[in-house]
Amino acid sequence: MAVAYADKPNHFINFPLTQFQGFVLNYKGLQFQLLDEGVDCKIQTAPHISLAMLDIQPEDYRSVDVAIQEVIDDMHWGEGFQIKFENPHILGRCIVLDVKGVEELHDDLVNYIRDKGCVDDQSRKWIGHCTIAQLTDAALSIKGNVDFINSMQFNYKITINPSSPARLEIVKLGAEKKDGFYETIASHWMGIRFEYNPPTDKLAMIMGYCCLEVVRKELEEGDLPENDDDAWFKLSYHYENNSWFFRHVYRKSSYFRKSCQNLDCNCLGFYESSVEED
C-alpha cells in the first residue's frame, strides 16, 4: 500500500525551545550578530524544532494528540538524551542550525501518528534543524552575507530528561506567536507520565463497575466504550500502566480524581468525602 505524505502540510509537531534559557541566550546572540552585520532578514521569535509535518483536519486532532501521548509513554529515558545544535548555515532562504539527537523521536512520532491513519512526514528526507532567521531575496544574493553566515560559530547542547521543560505540541502552520511560543492545538510535557501516579496497584482497589457510568458522564462522548467490560478494561489498563488515558480521565472527571484521592469510591453515596480537590 502506498504511503501518503504531508507534502502540502497544514500543521506540524513542535518542540519549543524558548523555555531553555541558556540555549535562548546563545541563540539570540547569533541573531544579534546578523543584525549588527546588517544582514537583511526576518528574525525567528519562537525558536523551535519541527519534528514532523502533518496534513490533517480538525477531526484528526484527537488521534494525533493520543499518538503524541503514546510516544511519551513509550519513551525509554535512561539518563535522558542530548540535543545538539551546531553549524549555522543557509537552508533554502533560512539561516538554520543543524540539530542532532532527535532522529529517533522524529521516527517514533511519524510511525505512531501514521498508525492512527493520519498523514504525516514528507517524501523528501527529514533534516533536523532550528531556524534562526529568514533572508530576503536581496540579502541572499549578496556574497558578503553568505560568507559571513558561513563563518558563524555555534555549539550548544540541551539535556532532556523527565524533569526537563520539554514539550511536544500540535501547531497549525501560520499560527500566532506570543512570548516566544506558538499558539497550540495541544501541548504535552514530555515527562507528563510522572505528573500523576496511580495511588494503588489495581483500579479495583479503589472503585468498581458501579462507577463507570458516573465517570462516563464527565468524559467526552466515545472516551469510554459503551460496553462496561470494554470500558473497565480500557480504564484499568491505562490506570495500572500509568499511561495517557489514565491522565486524560484524571483531568476530565472530578469523580475519578476524588476516588483516587480518597482511595475509595462514592458512586452509591455511602459517605461524604472529607477530601477537597486542589
Swiss-Prot record:
InterPro entries: Coronavirus_NS2A, NS2A-like
Highest taxon in the source lineage: Viruses
Similarity annotation: Belongs to the coronaviruses ns2a protein family.
Protein known as: Non-structural protein 2a
Source organism of the structure: Bovine coronavirus (strain 98TXSF-110-LUN)
Organism placement in taxonomy: Viruses, Riboviria, Orthornavirae, Pisuviricota, Pisoniviricetes
